[in-house]
Amino acid sequence: MATFVLVHGAWFGSWCWQKIIPFLKAAGHEVYAPTLTGLAERASELSPEIGLDTHIQDIVGLLLEKDLHGVILVGHSYGGIVITGVVDQVPERIAHLVYLDTFVPRNGESMADISPLVIRLLRQQAQAHGDGWKINPRGTYGVTREPDRSWVLRSVTAQPLKTFE
């Protein structure tokens, strides 16, 4: 069977995969869904220094620590930018990349490179409501049904602006 590493998007954590993981495991797959530094249950680590490279190293570190090879690396939303950085660093460990509702950057690109308008809006949000360095979550990101909507609202956390730059 396959080994999956599921990388969540901005404002989220490994919690967003909890309804998917049982299906993958029931099919006999090995599944890892780490929470990126400073987010969700790791929100106490949130700081202005956390950037995209921090999150790339979170995943590279997992692959090395667990000695994973032949990995199917899934990136949702912002996680797509993270997995692109991961495959740049350890391509020999990755079998497939799956971009799930995400941006698909070229090697070395960040969100600032892909969408200058979005990054400008995020900077404005950080200045207005996030002490100049963090972006607070907004809404439920398309989740409209209860109890999932309430679950998302309880679970999302602030995201460092530097992760998009």
Regions found by a protein language model. Give the residues of each.
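Hydrophobic, aromatic-enriched alpha-helical segments typical of multi-pass transmembrane helices
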Residues: 1, 14, 23, 33-34, ...
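Conserved HGGG/HGGXW glycine-rich cap/lid loop of the alpha/beta-hydrolase fold
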Residues: 2-43, 64, 72
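Glycine-rich His-Gly loop
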Residues: 7-10, 76-77, 102
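Active-site loop/oxyanion-hole signature of alpha/beta-hydrolase fold enzymes
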Residues: 30, 36-72, 88-89, 112-117
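Gly/Ala-rich beta-loop-alpha elbow adjacent to hydrolase catalytic centers
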Residues: 74-75, 79, 83
